Amino acid sequence: MNRLPSSASALACSAHALNLIEKRTLDHEEMKALNREVIEYFKEHVNPGFLEYRKSVTAGGDYGAVEWQAGGLNTLVDTQGQEFIDCLGGFGIFNVGHRNPVVVSAVQNQLAKQPLHSQELLDPLRAMLAKTLAALTPGKLKYSFFCNSGTESVEAALKLAKAYQSPRGKFTFIATSGVFHGKSLGALSATAKSTFRKPFMPLLPGFRHVPFGNIEAMRTALNECKKTGDDVAAVILEPIQGEGGVILPPPGYLTAVRKLCDEFGALMILDEVQTGMGRTGKMFACEHENVQPDILCLAKALGGGVMPIGATIATEEVFSVLFDNPFLHTTTFGGNPLACAAALATINVLLEQNLPAQAEQKGDMLLDGFRQLAREYPDLVQEARGKGMLMAIEFVDNEIGYNFASEMFRQRVLVAGTLNNAKTIRIEPPLTLTIEQCELVIKAARKALAAMRVSVEEA
């Protein structure tokens, strides 16, 4: 039987939520009630599958750990009052930490004036952010399209490349194996994981995948496309594959891809949604090889962990296809004043505090510690790898990876797996993580591995 809508129920639920939002703290009974409510509502109204995922990466299969608030700049607090060092970083959102005061202040100040733009008048912060990104990004990148997420930024990049290359008779895209570019129809066509692709087949035509890091495979694909008349519009790739398991290409790979794109007249799209904004020790990962893309995709950390925002930045030559009709690709909330305020403040913090350099220093410290643990526990750990504050620990099998996440949860350190590689746990903390917290994370990882070895020996 169809359920009738209930205004009274909706009003009561929204009022209850607003009451919780107003509260800074909860007593013990309120915490227990909130946990029960959240679990029930996820099961009945969000997606019960998320409960099982959360259960797999928390201590003892307890999915009752409900996030309540940020603790310090680099920590989270649940409804039980337990504080966790955040080594997940919202999958790369919190580069400048949780509730960074500079970012929060900028958003609050803008909120007091104008939260959203009229859609008709010129909005100043969008212009200022576009100018800032033109100055910050490498090469001839000049014009920015703003959206709300990484997937949207990739979608815009693909459409922009199509609009530019279609008059030239170039319609094919080359992506790489193991890559993750998002889950909208266009972005999913570039994504390489069958689990996400199969339910939505057929996807957009014209996408090919080649092994990541293999420059000869890239050259072969470009040559084959040219011979068959399927000329390549663009090559799209991540400088370091995040969801693929923090996979680093061989040195010089990006430079070689750039040369091939120039040789075959293909655009180079770099998806820096996860690697950008200082994460790898440079503001953008492509700067490690001084590579200049034609189109650059940003999101995640661009909003400072306070507002969602994505950006697609392109050269004037490429972006000019939108000049005659700027409404060819738009979004209602993209580039709104609150999001732009957050992004401008985030960039300011990254530069003022030199956080990319800090990411390199602290990332080296963490990675040295994880590699030492890999040497101490070769029966459990296959490899520790990474660049800057984007790291991964790969285990010998999937189950060990899940157990490690649970043990780290017991040690009050939050980590999680990657979408495309179940054996790999990603370490992606805020760039603001302190040296003392870095040391605590390494100690927690050592305790977790020691406990896991005992469990294996007793089994």
UniProtKB/Swiss-Prot annotation:
Gene3D superfamilies, per the entry: Aspartate Aminotransferase, domain 1, Type I PLP-dependent aspartate aminotransferase-like (Major domain)
Residues found modified as N6-(pyridoxal phosphate)lysine: K300
EC number of the protein: 2.6.1.82, 2.6.1.29
Ranges in coiled-coil conformation: none
Pathway: Amine and polyamine degradation; putrescine degradation; 4-aminobutanal from putrescine (transaminase route): step 1/1
Source species, domain of life: Bacteria
Single GO biological process annotation from the record: putrescine catabolic process
Needed co-factor(s): pyridoxal 5'-phosphate
Transmembrane residue ranges: none
Transferase listed as a keyword: yes
Gene Ontology molecular functions: diamine transaminase activity; identical protein binding; putrescine--2-oxoglutarate transaminase activity; pyridoxal phosphate binding
The UniProt record lists the keyword Transferase: yes
Protein keywords: Aminotransferase, Pyridoxal phosphate, Transferase
Catalytically driven reaction(s): an alkane-alpha,omega-diamine + 2-oxoglutarate = an omega-aminoaldehyde + L-glutamate; putrescine + 2-oxoglutarate = 1-pyrroline + L-glutamate + H2O; cadaverine + 2-oxoglutarate = 5-aminopentanal + L-glutamate
InterPro entries: Aminotrans_3, Aminotrans_3_PPA_site, Class-III_PLP-dep_AT, Putrescine_aminotransferase, PyrdxlP-dep_Trfase, PyrdxlP-dep_Trfase_major, PyrdxlP-dep_Trfase_small
Residue sites binding pyridoxal 5'-phosphate per the record: G150, T151, Q274, T332
Cited function: Catalyzes the aminotransferase reaction from putrescine to 2-oxoglutarate, leading to glutamate and 4-aminobutanal, which spontaneously cyclizes to form 1-pyrroline. This is the first step in one of two pathways for putrescine degradation, where putrescine is converted into 4-aminobutanoate (gamma-aminobutyrate or GABA) via 4-aminobutanal. Also functions as a cadaverine transaminase in a a L-lysine degradation pathway to succinate that proceeds via cadaverine, glutarate and L-2-hydroxyglutarate.
Homology family: Belongs to the class-III pyridoxal-phosphate-dependent aminotransferase family. Putrescine aminotransferase subfamily.
UniProt protein name: Putrescine aminotransferase
Phylogenetic classification of the source organism: Bacteria, Pseudomonadati, Pseudomonadota, Gammaproteobacteria, Enterobacterales
